[in-house]
């Protein structure tokens, strides 16, 4: 018979092994091996988040190490240096998540790894530090849910104080205080905010001095949420800037030549600056598209934007045909990424190198079962192993 005893001290993990030959044998041997916790952490850091979630079920010892704040923060920091592509497939009202390495040099095919699936979900937000926010039907009610697609953990948020039809939900992050927040925006001067990590899940009403109608795109950059809107009082096109930390709104009036890019394009993070990608078909690109425009906000106070036009290669029309592509964003190596709106076989994503003016495609394998279904692609997804209930 063999038994295994493990203890965790402040700086050292003790593993004791006892081997008993027979009940009648007076001879017993016991060996103890002490392994520093930092070595255990280093081993765990090499595992994917999906495996970390499984390790929590092994023993109290394992979960005590994995739940340490220094471990979860270090795991997230390392994940930031190895970003992934996140794919979300919608089928029969369910969401299915897959991840794939985000290639620094996209010259070869890649395989997507199945993560988790969630039922009766819609209205998906962009990933924020490994987490996603969406709406889901629970007990005939619509609730806001925070989920970790890598571990499968979910947390349903309480009902907002105001239940106006169709409020827009924004999931945002403030990097200085490391706080997640959910913003509900209505067609009025009143909005609601819920802060995660305060120990109490409750909505607060915040005021906005400019009632507005929201547009279709949004992006959070360095603690500021940007989204297009229309001023209800004047009818002007604007960009709303919500400071996540102070919870204050400010507004950028959109110049006439930028209206198409701001309201019909895709807002993105371009090297820490607000930018927009747009084509002749607005936020979509197909075989008929001739070029891509990149607008970058250079000075918010002066409302200065720079415009860059990139001509698509000659083979584009023949290769793409009637396939509809979405703008995903710009990679850290300055490549514009495009992805199909629906799962196709083969499923190719495209990288347009801004500096070399070249286009490359990468085939993503592993999602063939979802052919013909809606798929969303996200850049710079990271794995987060922090338990959701520890964030509130």
UniProtKB/Swiss-Prot annotation:
Species this protein is from: Arabidopsis thaliana
InterPro entries for this protein: F-box-assoc_dom_typ3 (IPR013187), F-box-assoc_interact_dom (IPR017451), F-box-like_dom_sf (IPR036047), F-box_dom (IPR001810)
Domain of life: Eukaryota
Coiled coil: none
SUPFAM superfamilies reported for this sequence: F-box domain
One protein family per Pfam: FBA_3
Gene3D superfamilies found in the cross-reference section: 1.20.1280.50
Boundaries of every F-box domain copy: 29-78
Name of protein: F-box protein At5g65850
């Amino acid at each position: 018979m063999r038994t295994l005893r493990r203890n965790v001290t402040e700086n050292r993990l003790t593993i004791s092994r006892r081997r008993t030959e027979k009940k009648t044998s007076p001879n017993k041997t016991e060996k103890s091996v002490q392994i520093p916790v930092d070595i255990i952490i280093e081993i765990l850091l090499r595992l994917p988040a999906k495996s970390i979630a499984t390790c929590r079920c092994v023993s109290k010892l394992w979960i005590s190490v994995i739940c340490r704040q220094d471990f979860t923060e270090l795991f997230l920091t390392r994940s930031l240096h190895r970003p992934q592509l996140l794919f979300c497939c919608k089928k029969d009202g369910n969401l299915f998540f897959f991840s794939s390495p985000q290639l620094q040099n996209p010259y070869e095919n890649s395989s997507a790894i199945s993560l988790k699936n969630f039922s009766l979900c819609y209205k998906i937000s962009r990933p924020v530090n490994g987490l996603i926010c969406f709406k889901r039907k629970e007990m005939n009610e619509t609730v806001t849910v925070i989920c970790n697609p890598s571990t499968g953990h979910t947390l349903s948020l309480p009902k907002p104080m105001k239940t106006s039809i169709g409020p827009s939900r924004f999931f945002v992050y403030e990097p200085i205080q490391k706080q997640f927040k959910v913003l509900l925006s209505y067609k009025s001067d009143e909005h609601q905010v819920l802060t995660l990590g305060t120990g109490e899940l409750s909505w607060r009403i915040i005021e906005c001095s400019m009632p507005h109608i929201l547009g279709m795109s949004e992006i959070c950059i360095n603690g500021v949420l940007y989204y297009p809107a229309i001023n209800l009082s004047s009818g002007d096109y604007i960009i709303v800037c919500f400071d996540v930390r102070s919870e204050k709104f400010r507004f950028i009036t959109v110049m006439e030549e930028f209206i198409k890019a701001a309201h019909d394009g895709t807002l993105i993070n371009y090297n820490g600056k607000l930018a927009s990608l747009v084509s002749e078909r607005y936020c979509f690109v197909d075989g008929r598209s001739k070029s891509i425009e990149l607008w970058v906000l250079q000075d918010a106070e002066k409302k200065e934007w720079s415009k860059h036009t990139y001509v698509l290669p000659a083979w584009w029309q023949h290769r793409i045909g009637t396939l509809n592509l979405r703008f995903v964003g710009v990679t850290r190596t300055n490549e514009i990424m495009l992805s199909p709106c629906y799962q196709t076989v083969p499923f190719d994503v495209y990288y347009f190198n801004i500096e070399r003016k070249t286009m490359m495609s990468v085939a993503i394998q592993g999602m063939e079962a979802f052919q013909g279904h809606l798929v969303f692609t996200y850049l710079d997804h990271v794995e987060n192993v922090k338990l959701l209930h520890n964030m509130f």
